[in-house]
């Protein structure tokens, strides 16, 4: 390191040319160490360069600039030179850098290190050492940091701050190329890694975390080149120039790498030439960052341009390596700046991918901007007071590193927080899109604690060390909350290692986010976080991220994450490149690490998920799995923090354990962590080592993270590429919903991680009991050893223990086997068990009968005694009866008897239950009380009337109403209405029936009480049926009353035995039109009414069912009609449809039959058949009212066939209902249905009536013998010739009447004799292959007849509508054209015509 520092001390060129920036140096990039004077000179050169520069390719050599050479002198000079600038730069770097996402926190560090950058690397090494030594003092420095103080502090930790600054500069200058990334990593390692590492030696826990994180950052191969740029950048760090996303990403990577690389360059240069060339690379980067500086613009949030995933994969591989290396550096306090730098540098080179990932997240927020500011500072040196800014930035970096350590420890898991916050910030900016949105929150939280430090770039290394130490102490469980980062690390390495590396990465991302937030507060925090060891703490934070947003999408586009990874083009991230794992991404990654056990676990986990979906785990089981997974997640994420308290040894052990665990994936920590990190871990063997380190630190982290879970960073979420790989977690939402949702509140990030882990771990439920599993995850994080052991156990369990599905299956098998193992039990034993169970059930049912009876008796007491007492009390107070006793007794009808009955029943039941062991029977009590139970039927029958009486009295009697209201409001009544209690006796009989039925089912057949129970049940059923009938009768009574009230006038509708059956509206066919009529069907009559406008009904007639006939018409045209013939009135009814007509026909017919049967019962000597025959015989002409044929259905006299005209009018025969002319209806006769009243009858009926009259004994005053008073006049008129000439009708036309019943087809059709002839509506009948034409449906003579033989029928097709027209052709000529009402009828008519045309 000394030789390297010496080589680095001589600054050969103020602006080292970024040569080979694009070239990707090997993980330990060996770059020539150009002699660079003071870092300040390169800064000046950088300042001269344009603010924004294309992504310059910085050669590894240039990146290798040694910030170490002038360890303390140059930093002092820089500080002195920059002291004037320090106030400005301090303000900028502290507040502006922190707040301004453009300013690179590493740059603020570099601003302090501007001098440092100009000075040899040794200075950086010293800075790093100071950072390590001064973490505790860092907070004080931050608080006391002022422009003067910043300069002083800058000088105090010149070398370390300068190193940090140089590293930050390198970060800024890092180009997109892997070399730039590596250089950036190297630079980040130097400033951030060394301070963090120095802190790490003091506190292995923090170091482990930060080292993991920083290693991730150092992963970039461009660290060395970015170091150069970063050196220069520090001066501009406070400035917030913006670099292109690619550059910013590269810068972020470089910054992270450079921050780490600076510290690591000093220590690692011997190991990796990159460290040796760290100073040079920084200077070179400064020059190379000239283009970056060109990009140095006020910070503008830019999403990193997506870069090839190859870079991500490489970066991740390196990150894992660095994770391992940081663990070592963390473990080895001896690895001060140089050792840390080497480790970080190697790790960055190895894990450039990882660094890229974390840095990407960090870059997202502002790495590019910080890089640009660094470049500007290097170029201009004036943007932020060079020396002061550099020193201040370094101090801030140191302070931030501790604070970030705290935060890092929280976030380092996901993102290599080891990098200075500035670097993180830059990195964060570049990879904003890559980072999940949730991360910024946590970063903000972590940084929020650090903002004061951030604001003070002047903070000396000791304060930074303080913070680092404090951050060790702080390993905030919130950091765990930033488990997202931790999860990332964990994924990258192994379950645990993967969690570590992923959390480190995510921590970097979070820190980048924090830095963005800190950026606003101040870059110093970034500087503090820049320390590689700060990042591991964030790893512990990952659990928080995982819990809150295991699958939350990141605000940045997935490509942004990709870009971040791509920014480490030199180190393609395997996780990004790798196909996304299944929803078990984390577990899969772990399993990949795990040679054999991983695949089984993955399978088992899928099985577990499937089983959960299909079978549904018990909540406790789910929690168990979750808790175990949480344990692993916490252990892995929390180990770094937990280990830090333990020391380096625990970290080393953690590494070994982590590797083992990683080889054996235990649990997915967070959805993101699991997916990205796991994939990364799968791709890299390095990840296992990284995971091992992280595993060590994870134990501690778990402790701190567990604490943090309830601590600061619960809401933190890592912005990690994991969101980019959300598809891997597609299944997670279900699992998360199942587990995490309940746990989110209490699990925080660690809980999330744990939950995720549990999701992925199938075996955890089996590792520990439900309760233990749930508690263990949270408690295990508390002890690093325990957490590691738990992790190991979990790993073992994952591979060794059966999968959840297997467990479920095994549990099911156990259940089956437990049953099947019993074999076929002994029938006697089974019977005994069954008998015992039945006896127990019988006892419980008997107790239920008794208890329910006790409640019922209390209700009866309330009504019979309490209510009566309330009424009596009110009467005494009033001095007169509130209500008559008669009315009160009616309201409480039969309640006294029921109260006495049930009180005695209860008493006997209680006695039986007391002596149940001696005499197990209660049914005999019901048999004995059975006859009295029929009192319930009486009560039920009077219930409606009694309730109505109660309502009536309440309305009429205000005093009684007040008593009722007061009683109902009393506690005794429980604020229930009195009617509620009056209904209880109605419900009691059905309760008896149910209870006794259940009692009988559970009784043994040989039981003493079996027979009595059957008898008691029969009695109760009889009473229940009677009560039901009574209730139905009550409903029927209500309906009858309603109908009676709806009729206008006074009509006695309510009759004993009358039952309402059906009601509805039918159209009555009057003489000329159809009119609506309302019909009510009873079991003995048909009520025929006319609706009125008032809503009531006018009673037209009540038709008795006796002698009524109902039939449907025979004509095809009247299928909706219904003909009703009764003694009083007969008519034709038309329903709205054939179905409705059929319903009414069935209801009336069945009612007529039932009514006839009832009447026969009163005449036992006659049978039903005889009665029907007698009825046929006894219905002579005139006994029933005929159905009048509507006027429109006849156009001629049905006797003489004379056509009706305006003067020759229609008349109806009152005996047969036919339409006749006046000449044919001149006679009158007394008809029976009219009570002997004379009525017009046709000649045919008159003759028939006379015959009947002669057959019967002569009747006095027989209407047949008497004519009406005007009979003489009428006879005279009839004798006068009417002068009407009767039309002679051929006999052939009279052979068939229109209403014939044996026709082939009949109905109305429209007929036309030609296309231009008008349509006529006529009635047609086809009979005996002859077509008869009638003017109306009831005409007795046809207008014409036409044989159909020799004719043909064709359908006339209509394109626009269904064809309803068909033609009758004779020899091809149209004879007639017919049109039906619908297509169906048309087809039927065509078929009928065709049948008639064929012999």
Swiss-Prot record:
A zinc finger (FYVE-type) spans 1191-1250. Residues 1059-1153, 1302-1398 form the PH domain. Residues 1-99, 138-164, 185-210, 235-281, 299-341, 367-479, 515-542, 631-650, 657-678, 768-840 are annotated as: Disordered. Disulfide bonds: none annotated. GO terms for molecular function: guanyl-nucleotide exchange factor activity; zinc ion binding. Zn(2+) 2 binds at residues 1213, 1216, 1242, 1245. The keyword Cytoplasm applies. PROSITE patterns: DH_2, PH_DOMAIN, ZF_FYVE. The keyword Zinc-finger applies. InterPro entries: DBL_dom_sf, DH_dom, FGD6_N_PH, FYVE_RhoGEF_PH, PH-like_dom_sf, PH_domain, Znf_FYVE, Znf_FYVE-rel. Residues 259-276, 821-838 have a biased composition (Basic and acidic residues). The modification Phosphoserine is found at residues 494, 531, 583, 670, 697, 1167. Zn(2+) 1 binds at residues 1197, 1200, 1221, 1224. Gene3D superfamilies: Dbl homology (DH) domain (1.20.900.10), Pleckstrin-homology domain (PH domain)/Phosphotyrosine-binding domain (PTB) (2.30.29.30), Zinc/RING finger domain, C3HC4 (zinc finger) (3.30.40.10). It is found in: Cytoplasm; Cytoplasm, Cytoskeleton. Residues 802-817 have a biased composition (Acidic residues). May activate CDC42, a member of the Ras-like family of Rho- and Rac proteins, by exchanging bound GDP for free GTP. May play a role in regulating the actin cytoskeleton and cell shape. This is FYVE, RhoGEF and PH domain-containing protein 6.
């Amino acid at each position: 390191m000394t030789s390297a520092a010496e080589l680095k001390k001589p600054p050969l060129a103020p602006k080292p040319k970024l040569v080979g920036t694009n070239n990707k140096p090997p993980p330990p990039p060996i770059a020539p160490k150009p002699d660079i004077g003071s870092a300040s000179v390169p800064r000046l050169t950088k300042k001269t360069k344009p603010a924004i520069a294309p992504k310059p390719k910085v050669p590894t050599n240039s990146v290798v600039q040694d910030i170490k050479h002038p360890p303390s002198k140059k930093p002092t000079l820089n500080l002195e030179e920059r002291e004037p600038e320090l106030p400005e730069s301090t303000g900028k770097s502290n507040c502006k850098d922190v707040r301004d996402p453009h300013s690179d926190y590493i740059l603020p560090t570099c601003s302090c290190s501007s001098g440092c950058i100009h000075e040899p690397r040794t200075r950086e090494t010293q800075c790093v050492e100071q950072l390590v030594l001064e973490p505790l003092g860092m907070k004080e420095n931050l608080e006391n940091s002022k422009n003067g103080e910043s300069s002083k502090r800058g000088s105090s930790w010149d070398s370390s701050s300068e190193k940090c600054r140089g590293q930050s500069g390198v970060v800024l200058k890092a180009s997109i190329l892997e070399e730039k990334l590596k250089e950036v990593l190297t630079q980040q390692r130097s400033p951030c890694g060394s301070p963090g590492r120095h802190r790490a030696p003091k506190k292995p826990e923090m170091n482990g975390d930060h080292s993991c994180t920083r290693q991730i950052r150092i992963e970039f191969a461009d660290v060395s080149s970015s170091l150069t740029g970063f050196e220069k950048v520090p001066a501009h760090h406070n400035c917030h120039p913006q670099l292109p996303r690619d550059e910013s990403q590269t810068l972020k990577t470089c910054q992270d790498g450079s921050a780490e690389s600076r510290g690591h360059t000093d220590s690692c240069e011997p190991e990796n030439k990159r460290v040796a060339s760290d100073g040079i690379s920084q200077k070179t980067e400064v020059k190379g960052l000239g283009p970056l500086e060109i990009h140095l613009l006020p910070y503008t949030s830019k999403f990193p341009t997506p870069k090839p995933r190859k870079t991500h994969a490489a970066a991740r591989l390196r990150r894992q390596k660095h994770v391992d290396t940081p663990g070592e550096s963390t473990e080895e306090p001896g690895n001060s700046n140089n050792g840390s730098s080497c480790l970080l540098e190697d790790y960055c080179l190895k894990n450039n991918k990882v660094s890229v990932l974390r840095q990407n997240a960090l870059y997202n927020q502002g790495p590019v901007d910080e890089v640009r500011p660094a470049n500007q500072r290097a170029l201009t040196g004036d943007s932020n007071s060079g020396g002061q800014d550099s020193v201040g930035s370094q101090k801030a970096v140191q302070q931030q590193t501790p604070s970030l350590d705290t935060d890092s420890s929280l976030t380092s898991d996901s993102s290599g927080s080891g990098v200075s916050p500035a670097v993180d910030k830059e990195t964060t900016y570049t990879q904003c899109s890559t980072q999940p949105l949730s991360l910024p929150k946590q970063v903000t939280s972590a940084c929020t604690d650090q903002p004061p430090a951030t604001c003070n770039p002047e903070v000396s290394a000791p304060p930074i060390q303080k913070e680092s130490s404090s951050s060790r102490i702080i390993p905030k469980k919130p950091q765990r909350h930033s488990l997202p980062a931790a999860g990332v690390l964990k994924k990258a390495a192994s379950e645990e290692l993967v969690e570590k590396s992923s959390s480190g990465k995510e921590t970097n991302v979070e820190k980048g986010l924090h830095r963005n937030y800190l950026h606003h507060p101040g870059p110093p925090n970034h500087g503090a976080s820049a320390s590689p060891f700060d990042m591991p703490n964030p790893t512990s934070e990952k659990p928080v991220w995982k819990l809150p947003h295991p699958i939350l999408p990141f605000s940045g586009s997935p490509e942004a994450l990709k870009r971040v990874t791509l920014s480490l083009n030199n180190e393609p991230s395997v996780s990004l490149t790798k196909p996304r794992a299944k929803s078990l991404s984390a577990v899969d990654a772990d399993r990949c690490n795990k040679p054999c056990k991983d695949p089984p676990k993955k399978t088992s986990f899928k099985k577990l998920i499937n089983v959960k979906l299909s079978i549904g785990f018990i909540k406790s089981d789910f929690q168990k799995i979750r808790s175990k997974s949480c344990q692993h997640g916490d252990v892995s994420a929390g180990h770094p923090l937990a280990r830090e308290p333990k020391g380096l040894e625990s970290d080393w052990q953690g590494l070994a354990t982590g590797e083992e665990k990683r080889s054996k994936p235990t649990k997915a920590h967070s959805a993101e962590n699991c997916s990205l990190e796991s994939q990364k871990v799968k791709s890299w063997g390095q990840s296992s080592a990284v995971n091992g380190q992280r595993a060590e630190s994870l134990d501690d982290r778990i402790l701190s993270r567990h604490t943090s879970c309830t601590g600061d960073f619960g809401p933190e979420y890592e912005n990690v590429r994991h969101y980019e790989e959300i598809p891997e977690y597609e299944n997670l939402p279900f699992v998360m919903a199942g587990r995490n949702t309940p746990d989110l509140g209490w699990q925080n990030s660690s809980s999330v991680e744990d939950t995720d882990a549990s999701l992925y771990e199938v075996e955890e439920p089996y590792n520990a009991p439900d309760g233990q599993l749930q508690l263990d995850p949270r408690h295990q994080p508390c002890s690093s050893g325990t957490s590691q052991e738990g992790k190991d156990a979990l790993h073992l369990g994952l591979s060794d223990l059966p999968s959840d599905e297997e467990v479920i299956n095994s549990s099911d098998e156990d259940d089956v086997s437990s049953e099947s193992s019993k074999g076929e039990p002994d029938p006697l034993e089974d019977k005994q068990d069954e008998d015992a169970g039945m006896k127990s059930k019988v006892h419980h049912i008997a107790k239920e009968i008794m208890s329910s009876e006790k409640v019922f008796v209390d209700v009866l007491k309330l009504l019979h005694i309490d209510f009566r007492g309330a009424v009596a009390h009110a009467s005494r107070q009033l001095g007169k009866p509130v209500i008559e006793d008669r009315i009160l007794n009616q309201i409480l009808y039969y309640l006294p008897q029921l109260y006495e009955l049930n009180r005695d029943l209860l008493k006997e039941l209680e006695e039986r239950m007391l002596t149940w062991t001696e005499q197990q029977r209660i049914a005999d009590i019901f048999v004995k009380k059975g006859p009295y139970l029929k009192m319930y039927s009486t009560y039920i029958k009077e219930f409606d009337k009694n309730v109505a009486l109660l309502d009536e009295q309440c309305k009429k009697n205000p005093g009684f109403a007040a008593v009722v209201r007061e009683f109902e409001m009393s506690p005794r009544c429980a604020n229930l209405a009195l009617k509620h209690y009056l209904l209880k006796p109605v419900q009691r009989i059905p309760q008896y029936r149910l209870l006794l039925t259940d009692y009988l089912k559970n009784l043994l057949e040989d039981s003493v009480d079996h027979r009595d129970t059957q008898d008691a049940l029969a009695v109760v059923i009889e009473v229940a049926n009677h009560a039901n009938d009574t209730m139905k009768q009550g409903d029927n009574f209500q309906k009858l009353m309603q109908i009676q009230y709806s009729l206008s006038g006074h009509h006695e509708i309510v009759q004993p035995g009358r039952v309402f059956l059906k009601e509805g509206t039918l159209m009555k066919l009057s003489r000329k039109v159809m009119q609506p009529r309302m019909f009510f069907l009873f079991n003995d009559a048909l009520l025929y009414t006319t609706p009125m406008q008032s809503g009531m009904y006018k009673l037209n007639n009540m038709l008795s069912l006796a002698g009524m006939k109902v039939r449907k018409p025979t004509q095809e045209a009247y299928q909706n009609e219904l003909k009703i013939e009764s003694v009083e009135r007969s008519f034709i009814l038309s329903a709205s449809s054939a179905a409705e007509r059929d319903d009414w026909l069935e209801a009336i017919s069945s009612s007529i039959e039932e009514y006839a049967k009832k009447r026969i019962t009163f005449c036992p000597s006659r049978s039903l058949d005889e009665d029907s025959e007698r009825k046929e015989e006894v219905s002579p002409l005139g006994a029933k009212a005929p159905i009048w044929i509507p006027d429109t259905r006849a156009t001629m006299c049905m006797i003489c066939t004379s056509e009706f005209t305006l003067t020759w009018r229609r008349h109806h025969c009152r005996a047969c209902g036919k339409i006749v002319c006046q000449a044919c209806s001149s006679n009158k006769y007394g008809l029976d249905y009219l009570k002997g009243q004379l009525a017009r009858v046709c000649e045919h009926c008159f003759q028939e009536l006379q015959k009947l009259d002669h057959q019967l004994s002569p009747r006095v005053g027989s209407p047949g013998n008497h004519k009406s008073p005007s009979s003489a006049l009428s006879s005279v008129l009839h004798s006068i010739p009417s002068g009407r000439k009767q039309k002679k009708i051929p006999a052939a036309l009279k052979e068939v009447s229109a209403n014939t019943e044996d026709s082939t087809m009949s109905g109305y059709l429209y007929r036309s004799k030609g296309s231009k002839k008008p349509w006529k509506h006529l009635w047609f009948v086809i009979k005996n292959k002859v077509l008869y034409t009638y003017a109306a449906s009831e005409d007795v003579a046809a207008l014409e007849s036409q044989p159909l033989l020799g004719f043909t029928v064709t359908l006339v097709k209509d394109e626009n509508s269904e064809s309803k027209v068909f033609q009758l052709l004779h020899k091809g000529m149209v004879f007639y054209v017919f049109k039906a009402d619908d297509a169906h009828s048309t087809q039927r008519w065509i078929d009928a015509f065709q049948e008639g045309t064929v012999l």
